[in-house]
Each structure stands twice: as C-alpha cells, then as structure tokens.
Amino acid sequence: MQYNFKVEAFEGPLDLLLHLIHRYEIDIYNIPVADITEQYLSYVHTMKELQLDVASEYLVMAATLLQIKSKMLLPKHEEDVLDNGDDFIDDPRQELMERLIEYKKYKQVATELKEREQERAQLYTRPPIDFTSLQQEEETSLPLDVTLYDMLAAFQKLMRRKKAKKPVTTRITRQEIPIEQRMTDILKQLKIKGGRQSFYDLFVDDEREIMVVTFLAVLELMKNQQIIIEQEHNFDEIFVSSSNKSA
C-alpha cells in the first residue's frame, strides 16, 4: 500500500544539514563530513521509506556530500597547494560551509521578521495581560521547538527498538489502515490517557506497515495543529498532547 505524503515543512537539504549540525553540536566551520553524510543519508532513507515526498535537491545534496567525503579521503600532495604559493590547501568543505552560513543567516532574519510581525499583531489583538505570574513563567524552562526532523529521528530510534525486540521468526500479517482512521484512533487514545502520552507509546503494534501509518498520522495531526509535540531537551523523550483544535 502506497502513502505518498507531502510535508511542506521540510524546507530542503540545507535545512536538514543545519538541523544535524545543531542536534549534534557540530562546529559549522569544521564539519566532520563522514559523520554528517552518514546521518544525512539515514534521514533521507527514512523519508523515502515513509513515502514522504522527497524533493530531488535532497538527492543532489547526498551526491555532493559523498563527493566531498571522497575528496577528504584523498592524500594531500604538493600539487594540491594553490598556484599563488600560499600554504593554504583548498578545503573540499569550503563551498558547503559558505552555503550553510549564508542559509543560517537567512533563517535567522526570517525568524526575526516573523517574530516582529507577531508582536505587531498582538499590539492590536491581544487582551490586557496579567503580569502576576510572569516571573514564575520566566523561571520555567520552555520545551524545545520540535521539528519534523526531530520526529524523523524519534521514528528511526523507534524502528531500531522494535527491530531489536522482534523475534527473527515472527510472521507478519499485513493490514491496511487509512491514515484518517489512525488519526482518529490517536486522538481517542490521547483522550483516554488524559490528553498526553509518550510518542513511543502510540506505537503498540510491531508491524512495520502500521507503524508507518501511525507516524504519518502523527505528522498530519501536527500539520492540522490537532496535537502538540513537546521535548524538554535535545535527545529527550518526545510527548504528544491534545490541542484545543482536536475536539
């Protein structure tokens, strides 16, 4: 059964690379190409396995990373030194690094503009604020913004867990469940659990097909703002909560 699922929030390969750099606290000026390539290809493989609409530029970036990786493995010779006599040896990562830095600046500016727009809108639409609890709220650490790439990482971890627990001789009975039905089931499940549940606890079935449908249903509920995804710190467990739009 095919689930061709398009998610607009996947902004492109540079966005994925920046996510990996942030997630693994990598120095953008000294990218470990072998490690970042392995992680990048793992994400792309998972996206394709889920039948997400993977744009061609992701595959182009994959080829670029593999090319840079191969160049980094080549021995350095005297002829690699630039003709101008400088001792600097051309770094195969240089162009990618510059693109990432430029894209990071663009994202920061876009985020700042969006925040200013929201602040201006609140000046005219926001009711009077009660400041009595402001100090207490400031002292509380806010959850991280969970991206779709974080969700992919959580799904990869889940698949590894399930695979490790699954007996080799397990016989799989194929079931086909519509995404819409699974979305309804998840909302009912959250209601029974008091409105909040661990992301991993949504996957009670070990069958790969049902796990894929469940994950796509979670993404669709995220897109519809029917659920809220929370994660306190990087690599922490992800929790799913009902939103006021889920009723």
Swiss-Prot record:
GO biological process, one term: cell division
Pfam families recorded: SMC_ScpA
Keyword terms, alphabetized: Cell cycle, Cell division, Chromosome partition, Cytoplasm
Record keyword Zinc present: no
InterPro entries, alphabetized: ScpA, ScpA-like_C
Domain of life: Bacteria
Entry's localization field: Cytoplasm
GO CC annotations, alphabetized: cytoplasm
Principal location listed in the UniProt entry: cytoplasm
UniProt cross-references to PANTHER family, sorted A to Z: SEGREGATION AND CONDENSATION PROTEIN A
Function: Participates in chromosomal partition during cell division. May act via the formation of a condensin-like complex containing Smc and ScpB that pull DNA away from mid-cell into both cell halves.
Entry's family note: Belongs to the ScpA family.
Record note on quaternary structure: Component of a cohesin-like complex composed of ScpA, ScpB and the Smc homodimer, in which ScpA and ScpB bind to the head domain of Smc. The presence of the three proteins is required for the association of the complex with DNA.
Protein name: Segregation and condensation protein A
Species classification: Bacteria, Bacillati, Bacillota, Bacilli, Bacillales
